[in-house]
């Protein structure tokens, strides 16, 4: 299927070239940006996080955090870079990755296959699942970000929910101009 260039990563996220490639996931160059969320696609978010956590030496020791911060690492490790700010009463489910200078605020819930880039914020009572918060992205309070890519320096308002699950099991349909196109994803 031929996609317009507006759905490609270079068009959607032009400022990403200013960031170190070590701190952000590799977004698709030859297809729509959201294909990174498809667990079966080559170089998916899931595959990148699995590769990152299996070889990552710079994680903080979880014992150095407040006892109110909890970790579920039954399915994989929670990697938190030195320099990330983790506030009390947060919960993490691995595998997930929190970059240097990311901020995870009080009461946040970071679930499996989330990649929180440098200077991104997961705020008070916010939940992130199988998503990417690119550098400087903010879900500051009472947000849900699921199966999504939140762009560089995007700031969500209070209580915003990014979730698009088809209850009938079909894939999510995109509207691009007057066209309706299947995304290939049931959650997006």
Segments from the language model and where they lie:
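Terminal amphipathic alpha-helical/low-complexity segments used for targeting or macromolecular assembly
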Residues: 1-69
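Structural signal for interior beta-strand "rungs" in well-ordered beta-sheet cores
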Residues: 63-188
């Amino acid at each position: 299927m031929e996609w317009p260039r507006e759905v490609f990563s270079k068009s959607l996220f032009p400022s990403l070239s200013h960031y170190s490639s070590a701190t952000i996931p590799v977004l698709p160059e030859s297809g729509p940006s959201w294909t990174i969320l498809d667990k079966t696609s080559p170089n998916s978010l899931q595959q990148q996080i699995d590769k990152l956590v299996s070889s990552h030496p710079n994680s903080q020791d979880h014992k150095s955090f407040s006892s109110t911060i909890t970790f579920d690492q039954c399915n994989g490790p929670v990697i938190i870079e030195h320099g990330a700010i983790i506030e009390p009463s947060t919960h993490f489910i691995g595998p997930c990755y929190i970059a240097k200078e990311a901020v995870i605020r009080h009461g946040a819930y970071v679930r499996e296959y989330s990649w929180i880039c440098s200077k991104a914020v997961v705020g008070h009572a916010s939940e992130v699942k199988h998503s990417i918060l690119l550098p400087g992205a903010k879900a500051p309070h009472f947000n849900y970000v699921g199966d999504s890519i939140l762009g560089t320096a995007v700031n969500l308002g209070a209580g915003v929910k990014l979730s698009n699950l088809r209850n009938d099991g079909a894939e999510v349909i995109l509207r691009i101009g007057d066209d309706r196109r299947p995304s290939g994803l049931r959650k997006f």
